[in-house]
Curated annotation (Swiss-Prot):
Residues 1-21 form the signal peptide. Its main location: membrane. The keyword Acyltransferase does not apply. It is a lipid-anchor. A lipid is attached at residue 22 (N-palmitoyl cysteine). This is Uncharacterized protein YuaE. One of its GO terms (cellular component) is membrane.
Amino acid sequence: MFNRRVLFLSVFSCAVFMLSGCSSNRFASRDANATYVNTQLKIIPRSQEKIQAQSQCSRSFSLLQKLNTDKFSMYRNQFDEINDAYFFYKRNVDLMNKDSKELMASVLDSKLDMVCVRVDNASFVGIYGKMKKVMDL
């Protein structure tokens, strides 16, 4: 089942990349908003509790695209780096010993959580900045 999930996500990612080439949005090639983040978050196997938290991360990431494109791009790149590291892990997992597997899986999971916290915070700061203008009236 896990291999089917990885295969589906790989095919889905390729389809998104190919279809987004026709878009004029400069972020469209890798940033299908919530779809992009959901794809990134689902790549690493996660507990049910973390799966629920990823929906908030996804919404915050979509909001951040509208609030601050520079931060959005920065966090998109961080998601990409985590994704690349995970695919390295998957390609080489048979060569790793038990401790290496556990360490790499743990670091990837922690980094993914950290990027989600950063995205949530940046979205909050962006909303606060917009509301501060209104509050200062």
